[in-house]
Amino acid sequence: FAADEQAAAPAEQETALPADAQTAGEPEQQLTYVALGDSITSGVGLADMKYNIAQIGYDLQPNFEGYPSQCYTALVGKGLGLDRQHAINLGLPSLMSPDMVDMVQSSAMPKMNQASGSYYVYPEYQEYLRKADIISIQIGSNDALVPCIVGLGEATNWKSEQLAGLMVSGALRDFNFQKLGLFFEALNRMTLTFDESRATNRLLFRGMDEICDQAYTNVTASLPQIVAGIRALNPDAKIVLLGYTNPVPLLPAWNRYFSKLNRFAKDLAAQEGLIYVDIPRAQTAADGHPTVKGHQYIANQILNALK
């Protein structure tokens, strides 16, 4: 799936060291940018994403340097004049924030995440972090999304695929009565039994709060550990902390969750000397992942923050 034509950037685009730091005849040195994240970072939904089927889940190692040319890792790398050996995509689909803590601390998840179905072990994960000059962190959406989608499936005996797709698509982002109608239309099409309807209503109007409260606790506990783990490996790296886009503002629980997370991330960045990058309007596709324009927007936000 790799885009071979993106494999190397022209020398004149590479980031050069100051003249007095170079020796005559030596090639110009490049920075190294490493993007940590989940499926948003990896480029799920874009053409040319690379992966292999693994014994458990998927092997994303081919995507570390063979990522889609339209994902924000590629676009940030291009903006910084980096080739693919110096712009690394460590996005791991379905990753949740405690999983990223494990990856940063030991390059491995100790066991499979049963809720998300993910399990990753990459010895090179920490090595990439040690060599990085700039590291971006994107994590936390799955901490709420995965249990919400699983809970909706269990409540409806898995009749909820269309409603779940609508919820994560971004189609409900801008509230109006037409979109509220879409939501209830999808809900009614599921032809639920009385017990299923009761369980679904409880989840949507109460259970979501419980899920999002627990997710917020998990993410706010994990993010400082992720930052500390990165600094233990690489105290000199510049760390960029990405904010959050809410694909379902129609649901009050999700509004509160992402609003609180953005405030927490911004405060954490100020306390820890990180670069906070707000991405509230990243456009998403029907699967809830950024579109090409969404990745362009995220990349532009990062590059502007690095200026």
Indicate residue ranges for each PLM-predicted region.
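Surface-exposed intrinsically disordered loops and tails
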Residues: 49-67, 106-121, 177, 199
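Structural motif
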Residues: 95-107
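Sec-dependent signal peptide cleavage junction
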Residues: 1-7
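Short, solvent-exposed loop/turn and secondary-structure capping segments
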Residues: 44-48, 100-102, 146-151
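Alpha-helical cap/lid subdomain in secreted, periplasmic
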Residues: 113-307
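Serine-esterase "nucleophile elbow" of acetyl-processing enzymes
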Residues: 15-93
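Residue-level detector of flexible, active-site-proximal loop/helix-junction positions
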Residues: 40, 94-96, 246, 283
